[in-house]
Protein backbone atom coordinates (compact mmCIF):
# COMPACT_ATOMS: atom_id res chain seq x y z
CA UNK A 1 0.00 0.00 0.00
CA UNK A 2 1.34 3.45 -0.93
CA UNK A 3 0.10 6.66 0.69
CA UNK A 4 0.90 9.94 -1.05
CA UNK A 5 0.71 13.15 0.99
CA UNK A 6 1.39 16.72 -0.10
CA UNK A 7 0.95 19.97 1.82
CA UNK A 8 -2.59 21.35 1.72
CA UNK A 9 -4.49 21.82 -0.50
CA UNK A 10 -3.89 18.12 -1.11
CA UNK A 11 -5.44 14.86 -2.25
CA UNK A 12 -4.98 11.92 0.09
CA UNK A 13 -5.25 8.59 -1.66
CA UNK A 14 -4.63 4.96 -0.93
CA UNK A 15 -3.28 2.57 -3.53
CA UNK A 16 -4.34 -0.98 -2.75
CA UNK A 17 -3.26 -3.63 -5.24
CA UNK A 18 -2.03 -2.81 -8.73
CA UNK A 19 -4.90 -1.24 -10.64
CA UNK A 20 -5.60 2.08 -12.21
CA UNK A 21 -8.53 2.80 -9.94
CA UNK A 22 -7.94 4.34 -6.48
CA UNK A 23 -9.85 4.14 -3.24
CA UNK A 24 -10.39 7.77 -2.25
CA UNK A 25 -10.90 8.37 1.45
CA UNK A 26 -14.20 9.88 2.46
CA UNK A 27 -12.68 11.69 5.44
CA UNK A 28 -11.48 15.20 4.68
CA UNK A 29 -11.15 14.89 0.88
CA UNK A 30 -10.03 18.21 -0.62
CA UNK A 31 -10.04 18.81 -4.34
CA UNK A 32 -9.19 21.84 -6.41
CA UNK A 33 -12.83 22.82 -6.84
CA UNK A 34 -13.10 23.50 -3.12
CA UNK A 35 -15.74 20.81 -2.55
CA UNK A 36 -15.31 19.14 0.83
CA UNK A 37 -16.73 15.66 1.37
CA UNK A 38 -17.56 14.96 4.99
CA UNK A 39 -18.10 11.55 6.53
CA UNK A 40 -21.71 10.57 6.12
CA UNK A 41 -23.84 10.74 9.22
CA UNK A 42 -25.91 7.94 10.60
CA UNK A 43 -29.12 7.46 8.68
CA UNK A 44 -32.18 8.21 10.69
CA UNK A 45 -34.47 5.36 9.83
CA UNK A 46 -37.44 6.94 11.62
CA UNK A 47 -37.85 9.78 9.12
CA UNK A 48 -38.29 8.57 5.49
CA UNK A 49 -37.62 12.05 4.13
CA UNK A 50 -34.28 12.26 5.93
CA UNK A 51 -33.40 8.79 4.72
CA UNK A 52 -34.13 9.84 1.14
CA UNK A 53 -32.02 12.97 1.57
CA UNK A 54 -29.13 10.95 3.02
CA UNK A 55 -29.26 8.47 0.13
CA UNK A 56 -29.21 11.27 -2.42
CA UNK A 57 -26.31 12.88 -0.58
CA UNK A 58 -24.36 9.60 -0.62
CA UNK A 59 -24.99 9.22 -4.35
CA UNK A 60 -23.81 12.76 -4.94
CA UNK A 61 -20.66 12.12 -2.90
CA UNK A 62 -20.00 8.93 -4.87
CA UNK A 63 -20.28 10.85 -8.15
CA UNK A 64 -17.88 13.49 -6.83
CA UNK A 65 -15.43 10.76 -5.81
CA UNK A 66 -15.63 9.11 -9.24
CA UNK A 67 -15.05 12.47 -10.92
CA UNK A 68 -12.06 13.11 -8.65
CA UNK A 69 -10.61 9.69 -9.50
CA UNK A 70 -11.02 10.26 -13.24
CA UNK A 71 -9.41 13.68 -12.90
CA UNK A 72 -6.53 12.19 -10.94
CA UNK A 73 -5.99 9.41 -13.50
CA UNK A 74 -5.39 12.08 -16.14
CA UNK A 75 -2.60 13.57 -14.02
CA UNK A 76 0.82 12.80 -15.65
CA UNK A 77 2.51 12.42 -12.25
CA UNK A 78 -0.06 9.84 -11.17
CA UNK A 79 0.32 7.94 -14.45
CA UNK A 80 4.07 7.81 -13.91
CA UNK A 81 3.59 6.46 -10.39
CA UNK A 82 1.06 3.90 -11.58
CA UNK A 83 3.44 2.71 -14.28
CA UNK A 84 6.23 2.31 -11.74
CA UNK A 85 3.86 0.50 -9.40
CA UNK A 86 2.91 -1.91 -12.17
CA UNK A 87 6.53 -2.75 -12.96
CA UNK A 88 6.74 -5.29 -10.08
CA UNK A 89 10.36 -4.29 -9.51
CA UNK A 90 10.33 -1.77 -6.69
CA UNK A 91 9.89 -1.41 -2.98
CA UNK A 92 8.19 1.46 -1.15
CA UNK A 93 9.73 2.43 2.16
CA UNK A 94 9.08 4.98 4.87
CA UNK A 95 10.14 8.52 4.08
CA UNK A 96 12.54 9.99 6.64
CA UNK A 97 10.83 12.68 8.69
CA UNK A 98 13.68 13.70 11.01
CA UNK A 99 17.22 12.74 11.90
CA UNK A 100 16.05 11.70 15.35
CA UNK A 101 14.01 8.71 14.25
CA UNK A 102 14.34 5.35 15.95
CA UNK A 103 17.09 4.25 13.57
CA UNK A 104 20.83 3.57 13.47
CA UNK A 105 23.10 5.29 10.98
CA UNK A 106 25.01 2.94 8.72
CA UNK A 107 28.55 2.25 9.92
CA UNK A 108 28.35 4.44 13.06
CA UNK A 109 25.91 4.85 15.93
CA UNK A 110 24.97 8.48 15.87
CA UNK A 111 21.80 10.41 16.52
CA UNK A 112 20.31 7.25 17.97
CA UNK A 113 17.26 8.37 19.87
CA UNK A 114 14.06 6.59 20.60
CA UNK A 115 11.05 8.25 19.05
CA UNK A 116 8.35 5.74 19.88
CA UNK A 117 6.55 8.29 22.03
CA UNK A 118 6.75 10.88 19.25
CA UNK A 119 5.40 8.41 16.73
CA UNK A 120 2.57 7.51 19.06
CA UNK A 121 1.52 11.15 19.24
CA UNK A 122 1.50 11.57 15.47
CA UNK A 123 -1.68 11.03 13.47
CA UNK A 124 -2.03 7.67 11.76
CA UNK A 125 -1.99 9.36 8.38
CA UNK A 126 1.67 10.34 8.95
CA UNK A 127 2.78 6.96 10.30
CA UNK A 128 3.89 5.62 6.97
CA UNK A 129 5.18 2.21 8.02
CA UNK A 130 7.70 0.39 5.88
CA UNK A 131 6.48 -2.46 3.79
CA UNK A 132 6.77 -4.27 0.53
CA UNK A 133 3.90 -4.90 -1.83
CA UNK A 134 3.38 -8.49 -2.87
CA UNK A 135 1.37 -9.79 -5.78
CA UNK A 136 -0.27 -13.16 -6.01
CA UNK A 137 2.15 -14.47 -8.58
CA UNK A 138 5.83 -14.49 -9.41
CA UNK A 139 7.70 -14.32 -12.67
CA UNK A 140 10.49 -16.82 -13.26
CA UNK A 141 12.31 -16.82 -16.57
CA UNK A 142 14.98 -19.36 -15.56
CA UNK A 143 14.62 -22.96 -16.54
CA UNK A 144 13.30 -25.07 -13.70
CA UNK A 145 15.90 -27.45 -12.31
CA UNK A 146 14.33 -30.94 -12.10
CA UNK A 147 16.87 -31.99 -9.49
CA UNK A 148 15.59 -29.35 -7.04
CA UNK A 149 12.69 -31.49 -5.88
CA UNK A 150 11.27 -31.90 -2.44
CA UNK A 151 9.50 -35.22 -2.00
CA UNK A 152 10.41 -38.85 -2.57
CA UNK A 153 7.72 -39.14 -5.24
CA UNK A 154 9.18 -36.16 -7.10
CA UNK A 155 12.67 -37.62 -6.83
CA UNK A 156 11.44 -40.75 -8.60
CA UNK A 157 9.89 -38.63 -11.34
CA UNK A 158 12.71 -36.18 -12.05
CA UNK A 159 14.65 -36.45 -15.29
CA UNK A 160 18.07 -37.03 -13.73
CA UNK A 161 16.95 -40.08 -11.79
CA UNK A 162 14.97 -41.46 -14.73
CA UNK A 163 17.86 -41.29 -17.18
CA UNK A 164 20.19 -42.89 -14.63
CA UNK A 165 17.77 -45.79 -14.18
CA UNK A 166 17.61 -46.14 -17.96
CA UNK A 167 21.41 -46.15 -18.11
CA UNK A 168 21.55 -48.78 -15.38
CA UNK A 169 19.16 -50.99 -17.36
CA UNK A 170 21.25 -50.52 -20.51
CA UNK A 171 24.42 -51.48 -18.63
CA UNK A 172 22.78 -54.63 -17.26
CA UNK A 173 21.67 -55.66 -20.75
CA UNK A 174 25.08 -54.92 -22.26
CA UNK A 175 26.92 -56.80 -19.51
CA UNK A 176 24.74 -59.90 -19.97
CA UNK A 177 24.98 -59.74 -23.78
CA UNK A 178 28.74 -59.29 -23.85
CA UNK A 179 29.32 -61.96 -21.20
CA UNK A 180 27.42 -64.67 -23.07
CA UNK A 181 28.64 -63.35 -26.45
CA UNK A 182 32.24 -63.64 -25.35
CA UNK A 183 31.66 -67.25 -24.30
CA UNK A 184 29.60 -68.33 -27.33
CA UNK A 185 31.75 -66.57 -29.97
CA UNK A 186 35.07 -67.19 -28.19
CA UNK A 187 35.74 -63.44 -27.89
CA UNK A 188 38.00 -62.40 -25.02
CA UNK A 189 37.52 -58.75 -26.03
CA UNK A 190 33.76 -58.96 -25.46
CA UNK A 191 34.27 -60.87 -22.22
CA UNK A 192 36.63 -58.15 -20.93
CA UNK A 193 34.16 -55.45 -21.97
CA UNK A 194 31.43 -57.27 -20.03
CA UNK A 195 33.54 -56.98 -16.86
CA UNK A 196 33.88 -53.26 -17.52
CA UNK A 197 30.10 -52.94 -17.95
CA UNK A 198 29.68 -54.36 -14.44
CA UNK A 199 31.84 -51.52 -13.07
CA UNK A 200 29.56 -49.10 -14.94
CA UNK A 201 26.62 -50.36 -12.89
CA UNK A 202 28.49 -49.35 -9.73
CA UNK A 203 28.87 -45.87 -11.23
CA UNK A 204 25.13 -45.69 -11.99
CA UNK A 205 24.26 -46.72 -8.43
CA UNK A 206 26.55 -44.01 -7.02
CA UNK A 207 24.89 -41.47 -9.32
CA UNK A 208 21.39 -42.50 -8.20
CA UNK A 209 22.36 -42.29 -4.54
CA UNK A 210 24.02 -38.87 -4.79
CA UNK A 211 21.31 -37.29 -6.98
CA UNK A 212 18.55 -38.55 -4.68
CA UNK A 213 20.22 -37.32 -1.48
CA UNK A 214 21.25 -33.96 -2.96
CA UNK A 215 17.59 -33.12 -3.66
CA UNK A 216 16.64 -33.14 0.04
CA UNK A 217 15.59 -29.93 1.81
CA UNK A 218 18.07 -28.02 3.99
CA UNK A 219 17.79 -28.74 7.70
CA UNK A 220 18.99 -27.11 10.91
CA UNK A 221 22.04 -29.38 10.93
CA UNK A 222 22.69 -28.81 7.21
CA UNK A 223 21.50 -25.24 6.53
CA UNK A 224 23.19 -25.12 3.12
CA UNK A 225 21.46 -28.28 1.90
CA UNK A 226 22.87 -31.57 0.66
CA UNK A 227 24.28 -30.44 -2.67
CA UNK A 228 27.82 -31.46 -1.69
CA UNK A 229 26.69 -35.10 -1.65
CA UNK A 230 26.33 -34.89 -5.41
CA UNK A 231 29.81 -33.39 -5.59
CA UNK A 232 31.21 -36.34 -3.64
CA UNK A 233 29.36 -38.69 -5.99
CA UNK A 234 30.83 -36.84 -8.97
CA UNK A 235 34.31 -37.28 -7.50
CA UNK A 236 33.74 -41.02 -7.02
CA UNK A 237 32.38 -41.54 -10.55
CA UNK A 238 35.20 -39.50 -12.09
CA UNK A 239 37.76 -41.50 -10.10
CA UNK A 240 36.30 -44.78 -11.37
CA UNK A 241 36.39 -43.33 -14.89
CA UNK A 242 40.05 -42.29 -14.61
CA UNK A 243 41.07 -45.65 -13.14
CA UNK A 244 39.34 -47.45 -16.01
CA UNK A 245 41.28 -45.30 -18.47
CA UNK A 246 44.57 -46.03 -16.75
CA UNK A 247 43.78 -49.75 -16.78
CA UNK A 248 42.92 -49.79 -20.50
CA UNK A 249 46.02 -47.76 -21.36
CA UNK A 250 48.25 -49.96 -19.25
CA UNK A 251 46.95 -53.15 -20.89
CA UNK A 252 47.24 -51.67 -24.38
CA UNK A 253 50.79 -50.52 -23.66
CA UNK A 254 51.73 -54.00 -22.45
CA UNK A 255 50.32 -55.52 -25.64
CA UNK A 256 52.13 -52.94 -27.80
CA UNK A 257 55.59 -53.44 -26.28
CA UNK A 258 55.16 -57.21 -25.91
CA UNK A 259 57.38 -58.15 -28.86
CA UNK A 260 60.42 -56.31 -27.40
CA UNK A 261 60.02 -57.18 -23.70
CA UNK A 262 60.58 -60.62 -22.16
CA UNK A 263 57.41 -62.72 -21.83
CA UNK A 264 57.69 -63.11 -18.03
CA UNK A 265 57.73 -59.32 -17.50
CA UNK A 266 54.70 -58.91 -19.78
CA UNK A 267 52.78 -61.52 -17.80
CA UNK A 268 53.63 -59.79 -14.52
CA UNK A 269 52.62 -56.34 -15.81
CA UNK A 270 49.49 -57.71 -17.49
CA UNK A 271 48.29 -59.16 -14.19
CA UNK A 272 48.40 -55.65 -12.69
CA UNK A 273 46.07 -54.30 -15.37
CA UNK A 274 42.30 -54.21 -15.70
CA UNK A 275 40.23 -56.84 -17.47
CA UNK A 276 40.60 -54.81 -20.72
CA UNK A 277 43.65 -56.73 -22.02
CA UNK A 278 43.98 -56.80 -25.80
CA UNK A 279 47.11 -58.92 -26.18
CA UNK A 280 48.06 -61.23 -28.99
CA UNK A 281 46.50 -64.23 -27.26
CA UNK A 282 43.14 -62.45 -26.99
CA UNK A 283 43.07 -61.52 -30.65
CA UNK A 284 43.89 -65.05 -31.64
CA UNK A 285 40.77 -66.25 -29.79
CA UNK A 286 38.46 -64.07 -31.93
CA UNK A 287 37.26 -66.48 -34.58
CA UNK A 288 33.60 -65.59 -35.09
CA UNK A 289 32.69 -62.35 -36.86
CA UNK A 290 29.19 -62.45 -35.30
CA UNK A 291 30.72 -61.07 -32.10
CA UNK A 292 31.09 -57.78 -33.95
CA UNK A 293 27.29 -57.35 -34.01
CA UNK A 294 27.18 -57.29 -30.20
CA UNK A 295 29.93 -54.67 -30.09
CA UNK A 296 28.11 -52.55 -32.70
CA UNK A 297 24.83 -52.73 -30.77
CA UNK A 298 26.69 -51.71 -27.60
CA UNK A 299 28.15 -48.67 -29.39
CA UNK A 300 24.70 -47.53 -30.57
CA UNK A 301 23.08 -47.98 -27.13
CA UNK A 302 25.90 -46.28 -25.25
CA UNK A 303 26.07 -43.33 -27.64
CA UNK A 304 22.33 -42.74 -27.28
CA UNK A 305 22.43 -42.91 -23.47
CA UNK A 306 25.47 -40.58 -23.47
CA UNK A 307 23.66 -37.88 -25.44
CA UNK A 308 20.48 -38.15 -23.36
CA UNK A 309 22.35 -38.02 -20.03
CA UNK A 310 24.56 -35.14 -21.19
CA UNK A 311 21.53 -33.09 -22.24
CA UNK A 312 19.87 -33.50 -18.84
CA UNK A 313 23.17 -32.80 -17.04
CA UNK A 314 23.49 -29.47 -18.87
CA UNK A 315 19.87 -28.51 -18.13
CA UNK A 316 20.19 -29.38 -14.43
CA UNK A 317 23.76 -28.16 -13.93
CA UNK A 318 24.65 -31.57 -12.46
CA UNK A 319 28.33 -32.52 -12.41
CA UNK A 320 27.64 -36.09 -11.33
CA UNK A 321 25.30 -36.63 -14.28
CA UNK A 322 27.89 -35.12 -16.61
CA UNK A 323 30.55 -37.47 -15.24
CA UNK A 324 28.21 -40.42 -15.69
CA UNK A 325 27.44 -39.27 -19.25
CA UNK A 326 31.12 -39.30 -20.13
CA UNK A 327 31.36 -42.73 -18.58
CA UNK A 328 28.78 -43.87 -21.15
CA UNK A 329 30.83 -42.25 -23.93
CA UNK A 330 33.93 -44.08 -22.72
CA UNK A 331 32.00 -47.35 -22.83
CA UNK A 332 31.01 -46.71 -26.44
CA UNK A 333 34.66 -46.02 -27.32
CA UNK A 334 35.87 -49.20 -25.62
CA UNK A 335 33.20 -51.12 -27.52
CA UNK A 336 34.52 -49.47 -30.68
CA UNK A 337 37.98 -50.75 -29.83
CA UNK A 338 36.53 -54.24 -29.34
CA UNK A 339 34.73 -53.94 -32.70
CA UNK A 340 37.96 -52.93 -34.45
CA UNK A 341 39.83 -55.77 -32.76
CA UNK A 342 37.22 -58.33 -33.79
CA UNK A 343 36.98 -57.04 -37.38
CA UNK A 344 40.69 -56.64 -38.06
CA UNK A 345 41.53 -59.91 -36.37
CA UNK A 346 39.00 -61.77 -38.49
CA UNK A 347 39.46 -60.00 -41.84
CA UNK A 348 43.07 -58.85 -42.19
CA UNK A 349 44.67 -60.18 -39.02
CA UNK A 350 46.19 -56.75 -38.09
CA UNK A 351 46.66 -56.88 -34.34
CA UNK A 352 48.52 -53.60 -33.76
CA UNK A 353 45.44 -51.47 -34.59
CA UNK A 354 43.73 -52.75 -31.47
CA UNK A 355 46.54 -51.72 -29.13
CA UNK A 356 46.98 -48.28 -30.72
CA UNK A 357 43.22 -47.71 -30.52
CA UNK A 358 43.29 -48.79 -26.87
CA UNK A 359 45.94 -46.16 -26.08
CA UNK A 360 43.92 -43.43 -27.81
CA UNK A 361 40.75 -44.41 -25.96
CA UNK A 362 42.59 -44.55 -22.63
CA UNK A 363 43.84 -41.00 -23.18
CA UNK A 364 40.28 -39.75 -23.74
CA UNK A 365 39.07 -41.63 -20.67
CA UNK A 366 41.81 -40.29 -18.40
CA UNK A 367 41.21 -36.73 -19.67
CA UNK A 368 37.45 -36.89 -18.97
CA UNK A 369 37.93 -38.50 -15.56
CA UNK A 370 40.71 -36.10 -14.55
CA UNK A 371 38.67 -33.02 -15.47
CA UNK A 372 35.69 -34.34 -13.51
CA UNK A 373 37.90 -34.99 -10.47
CA UNK A 374 39.38 -31.48 -10.62
CA UNK A 375 35.94 -29.85 -10.85
CA UNK A 376 34.64 -31.91 -7.91
CA UNK A 377 37.69 -31.18 -5.73
CA UNK A 378 37.50 -27.43 -6.43
CA UNK A 379 33.82 -27.47 -5.53
CA UNK A 380 34.47 -29.37 -2.30
CA UNK A 381 37.04 -26.80 -1.15
CA UNK A 382 34.60 -23.97 -2.05
CA UNK A 383 36.26 -22.36 -5.01
CA UNK A 384 34.08 -19.44 -6.09
CA UNK A 385 32.36 -19.38 -9.47
CA UNK A 386 34.48 -17.46 -11.98
CA UNK A 387 33.35 -14.03 -13.13
CA UNK A 388 33.03 -15.12 -16.75
CA UNK A 389 30.76 -18.04 -15.85
CA UNK A 390 27.23 -17.65 -17.36
CA UNK A 391 25.68 -18.26 -13.92
CA UNK A 392 27.72 -15.41 -12.41
CA UNK A 393 26.91 -13.02 -15.26
CA UNK A 394 23.20 -13.81 -15.03
CA UNK A 395 22.98 -13.10 -11.28
CA UNK A 396 25.21 -10.00 -11.52
CA UNK A 397 23.01 -8.49 -14.23
CA UNK A 398 19.85 -9.34 -12.29
CA UNK A 399 21.16 -7.70 -9.09
CA UNK A 400 22.18 -4.50 -10.87
CA UNK A 401 18.84 -4.22 -12.70
CA UNK A 402 16.92 -4.76 -9.46
CA UNK A 403 18.96 -2.11 -7.61
CA UNK A 404 18.47 0.41 -10.43
CA UNK A 405 14.68 -0.02 -10.28
CA UNK A 406 14.54 0.08 -6.48
CA UNK A 407 12.51 2.95 -4.97
CA UNK A 408 13.57 3.37 -1.36
CA UNK A 409 14.48 5.84 1.37
CA UNK A 410 17.79 6.47 -0.37
CA UNK A 411 17.85 10.17 -1.39
CA UNK A 412 21.34 10.36 -2.92
CA UNK A 413 19.91 10.21 -6.47
CA UNK A 414 21.99 7.13 -7.24
CA UNK A 415 21.14 3.50 -6.46
CA UNK A 416 22.79 1.05 -4.12
CA UNK A 417 26.00 -0.23 -5.69
CA UNK A 418 27.06 -3.84 -6.12
CA UNK A 419 30.53 -3.85 -4.58
CA UNK A 420 31.16 -7.59 -4.50
CA UNK A 421 29.40 -10.78 -5.58
CA UNK A 422 30.59 -14.24 -4.56
CA UNK A 423 28.95 -17.45 -5.79
CA UNK A 424 29.73 -20.96 -4.53
CA UNK A 425 28.61 -24.19 -6.17
CA UNK A 426 27.05 -26.94 -4.09
CA UNK A 427 26.14 -29.73 -6.48
CA UNK A 428 23.35 -28.40 -8.70
CA UNK A 429 22.69 -25.55 -6.24
CA UNK A 430 24.28 -22.13 -5.73
CA UNK A 431 25.06 -20.06 -2.64
CA UNK A 432 25.60 -16.34 -2.96
CA UNK A 433 27.06 -13.48 -0.91
CA UNK A 434 26.38 -9.86 -1.88
CA UNK A 435 28.16 -6.77 -0.60
CA UNK A 436 26.12 -3.65 -1.36
CA UNK A 437 27.56 -0.15 -1.13
CA UNK A 438 25.14 2.38 0.35
CA UNK A 439 25.64 5.86 -1.18
CA UNK A 440 26.14 8.93 0.99
CA UNK A 441 22.84 10.60 1.85
CA UNK A 442 21.81 14.23 1.37
CA UNK A 443 20.46 16.71 3.93
CA UNK A 444 21.42 14.51 6.87
CA UNK A 445 19.11 11.70 5.80
CA UNK A 446 19.75 8.58 7.90
CA UNK A 447 18.86 5.15 6.58
CA UNK A 448 17.28 2.80 9.08
CA UNK A 449 17.83 -0.85 9.83
CA UNK A 450 14.26 -1.45 8.75
CA UNK A 451 15.10 -0.28 5.24
CA UNK A 452 18.01 -2.68 4.91
CA UNK A 453 15.80 -5.54 6.05
CA UNK A 454 13.21 -4.72 3.40
CA UNK A 455 15.80 -4.28 0.63
CA UNK A 456 17.34 -7.62 1.64
CA UNK A 457 13.95 -9.33 1.57
CA UNK A 458 13.14 -7.84 -1.83
CA UNK A 459 16.46 -8.86 -3.39
CA UNK A 460 16.13 -12.39 -2.08
CA UNK A 461 12.63 -12.71 -3.49
CA UNK A 462 13.66 -11.46 -6.93
CA UNK A 463 16.80 -13.60 -7.18
CA UNK A 464 15.28 -16.83 -5.86
CA UNK A 465 12.31 -16.43 -8.21
CA UNK A 466 14.49 -15.80 -11.25
CA UNK A 467 17.30 -18.26 -10.41
CA UNK A 468 15.68 -21.52 -9.32
CA UNK A 469 18.88 -23.19 -8.08
CA UNK A 470 19.95 -20.29 -5.83
CA UNK A 471 19.34 -21.83 -2.41
CA UNK A 472 20.87 -19.21 -0.08
CA UNK A 473 21.76 -15.52 -0.37
CA UNK A 474 23.60 -13.48 2.28
CA UNK A 475 23.64 -9.68 1.92
CA UNK A 476 26.06 -7.27 3.58
CA UNK A 477 25.94 -3.46 3.52
CA UNK A 478 28.93 -1.11 3.62
CA UNK A 479 28.99 2.67 3.63
CA UNK A 480 30.31 4.57 0.66
CA UNK A 481 33.49 6.54 1.30
CA UNK A 482 33.46 10.16 0.20
CA UNK A 483 36.25 11.71 -1.82
CA UNK A 484 37.91 13.56 1.06
CA UNK A 485 37.95 10.45 3.21
CA UNK A 486 39.50 8.40 0.42
CA UNK A 487 42.19 11.03 -0.20
CA UNK A 488 42.97 11.15 3.54
CA UNK A 489 43.34 7.37 3.73
CA UNK A 490 45.47 7.33 0.58
CA UNK A 491 47.68 10.08 2.01
CA UNK A 492 48.18 8.15 5.24
CA UNK A 493 49.19 5.04 3.29
CA UNK A 494 51.69 7.02 1.18
CA UNK A 495 53.14 8.60 4.34
CA UNK A 496 53.64 5.18 5.96
CA UNK A 497 55.32 3.86 2.81
CA UNK A 498 57.71 6.85 2.73
CA UNK A 499 58.60 6.34 6.40
CA UNK A 500 59.30 2.65 5.83
CA UNK A 501 61.49 3.40 2.80
CA UNK A 502 63.51 6.00 4.73
CA UNK A 503 63.88 3.58 7.66
CA UNK A 504 65.17 0.82 5.40
CA UNK A 505 67.55 3.25 3.70
CA UNK A 506 68.96 4.35 7.10
CA UNK A 507 69.48 0.76 8.25
CA UNK A 508 71.31 -0.03 5.01
CA UNK A 509 73.83 2.76 5.58
CA UNK A 510 74.37 1.76 9.18
Curated annotation (Swiss-Prot):
GO terms for molecular function: monoatomic cation transmembrane transporter activity. Keywords: Ion transport, Iron, Iron storage, Iron transport, Membrane, Mitochondrion, Transit peptide, Transmembrane, Transmembrane helix, Transport. Residues 120-141 are annotated as: Disordered. Residues 130-141 have a biased composition (Basic residues). It comes from the Eukaryota. Pfam families: Cation_efflux (PF01545). SUPFAM superfamilies: Cation efflux protein transmembrane domain-like. GO terms for biological process: intracellular iron ion homeostasis; iron ion transport. The keyword Membrane applies. The chain crosses the membrane at residues 165-185, 194-214, 241-261, 286-306, 333-353, 356-376. Belongs to the cation diffusion facilitator (CDF) transporter (TC 2.A.4) family. SLC30A subfamily. NCBIfam families: CDF (TIGR01297). This is Mitochondrial metal transporter 1. It comes from Saccharomyces cerevisiae (strain ATCC 204508 / S288c).
Amino acid sequence: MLRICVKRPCIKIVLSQVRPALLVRKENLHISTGVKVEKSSIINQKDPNKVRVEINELKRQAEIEKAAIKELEKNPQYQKLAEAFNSHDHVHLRESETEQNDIISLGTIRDYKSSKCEQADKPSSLNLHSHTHSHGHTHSHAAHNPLLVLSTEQIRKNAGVRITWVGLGVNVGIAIGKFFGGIVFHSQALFADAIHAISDMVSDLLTLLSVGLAANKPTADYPYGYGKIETVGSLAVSTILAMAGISIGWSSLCALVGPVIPHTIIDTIGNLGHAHTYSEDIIEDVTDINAAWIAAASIAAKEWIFRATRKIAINTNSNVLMANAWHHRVDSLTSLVALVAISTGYLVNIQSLDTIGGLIVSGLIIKAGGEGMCIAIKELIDQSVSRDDPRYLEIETLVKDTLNKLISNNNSQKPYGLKELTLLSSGPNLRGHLTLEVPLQKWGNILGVNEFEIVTHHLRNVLTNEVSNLRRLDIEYVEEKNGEENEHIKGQQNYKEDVLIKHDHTNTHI
